């Protein structure tokens, strides 16, 4: 079977956006997981920013990974991927000019699409970790991203955190990003179908949801009718890999103590030590959670 080119995969992603169906992402974090996802029939994969931070730095999701580190991992995946890969490009690694550099590098890495979010990252002195940038700045980032791409088949998706906004504020932001030319809108933190319906009726571009398995949004047919084309349930595959590695090595060492039989969540916490970063952010930056 002939291999798909990067542009082929970008067109395949656009076909998903143009379809009438809803597709769930596979969490791909290295070349092997990308090959597995494609072989199992997943239509789309995602390289999450949080997962890249774990994989490359063994660090929690505090915007610590650099653009070059993220691009290197995306490039490794892009060499072998035979499914469209969506890159979670966080805040674009800086201002609108940095966003342009991010788009250039990720396009060369071979991703099919990328998200740019409007969270104020990295955390700023004296601000909340969930604060958003002004909508005007977010619009500038989307416009800059569109200007920077060479291959027009690369999809640029604007992302916002619905969990920290009123429904009215979500509508204003998402409509602004749609008007700026975003190929799709990604939202994290949508509570339920009632809220989604209120937002969706104001938008015409395809939608992407990061649900983390929210039980109030588990109806693919209903999601599809509301324009949702991509759903990110989370990154279970990555955490399962951590758990499998731990269990295998623990068995090799003959450590059968039940107290050491940790869950994937416990393992992630143990080996990334997020409480240290929270303490440092509060102590050195006066960042409020």
Swiss-Prot record:
Chain sites annotated for binding substrate: 50, 159, 235
Cofactor(s), names only, from the UniProt record: Mg(2+)
Keywords, alphabetical: Decarboxylase, Lyase, Magnesium, Metal-binding
Family designation: Belongs to the isocitrate lyase/PEP mutase superfamily. Oxaloacetate decarboxylase family.
Function: Catalyzes the decarboxylation of oxaloacetate into pyruvate. Seems to play a role in maintaining cellular concentrations of bicarbonate and pyruvate.
Record's subunit section: Homotetramer; dimer of dimers.
EC code(s) of this entry: 4.1.1.112
Binding site for Mg(2+): 88
Any single GO BP term: pyruvate biosynthetic process
HAMAP family per the UniProt record, alphabetical: OadC (MF_01299)
Bound cofactor: record note: Binds 1 Mg(2+) ion per subunit.
Pfam hit, one: PEP_mutase
Organism superkingdom: Bacteria
Stated name of the protein: Oxaloacetate decarboxylase
MF term (GO), any: oxaloacetate decarboxylase activity
Record field: catalytic activity: oxaloacetate + H(+) = pyruvate + CO2
InterPro entries, per database record: ICL/PEPM (IPR039556), Oxaloacetate_deCOase_bac (IPR023687), Pyrv/PenolPyrv_kinase-like_dom (IPR015813), Pyrv_kinase-like_dom_sf (IPR040442)
């Amino acid at each position: 079977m002939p291999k798909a080119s990067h542009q082929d995969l970008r067109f395949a992603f656009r076909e998903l956006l143009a379809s009438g169906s809803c597709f769930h992402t596979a969490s791909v974090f290295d070349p092997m997981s990308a090959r597995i996802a494609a072989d199992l029939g997943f239509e789309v994969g995602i390289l999450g920013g949080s997962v890249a931070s774990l994989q490359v730095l063994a660090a929690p999701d505090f915007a610590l990974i650099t653009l070059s580190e993220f691009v290197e991992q995306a490039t490794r995946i892009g060499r072998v991927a035979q499914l469209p890969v969506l890159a979670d490009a966080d805040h674009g690694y800086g201002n609108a000019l940095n966003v342009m550099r991010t788009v250039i590098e990720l396009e060369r890495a071979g991703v099919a699409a990328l998200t740019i979010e409007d969270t104020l990252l990295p955390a700023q002195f004296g601000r909340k970790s969930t604060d958003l940038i002004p909508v005007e700045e977010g619009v500038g980032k989307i416009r800059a991203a569109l200007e920077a791409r060479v291959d027009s088949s690369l999809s640029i998706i604007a992302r916002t955190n619905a969990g920290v906004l009123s429904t009215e504020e979500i509508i204003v932001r998402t409509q602004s990003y749609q008007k700026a030319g975003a190929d799709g809108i990604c939202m994290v933190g949508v509570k339920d179908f009632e809220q989604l319906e209120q937002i969706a009726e104001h938008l015409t571009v395809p939608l992407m949801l990061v649900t983390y398995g929210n039980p109030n949004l588990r109806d693919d047919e209903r999601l599809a009718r509301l324009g949702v084309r991509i759903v990110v349930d989370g990154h279970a595959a990555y955490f399962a890999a951590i758990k499998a590695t731990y269990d295998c090595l623990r068995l090799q060492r003959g450590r059968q103590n039940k107290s050491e039989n940790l869950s994937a969540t416990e393992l992630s916490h143990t080996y990334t030590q997020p409480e240290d970063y929270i303490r440092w952010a509060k102590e050195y930056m006066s960042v409020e959670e």
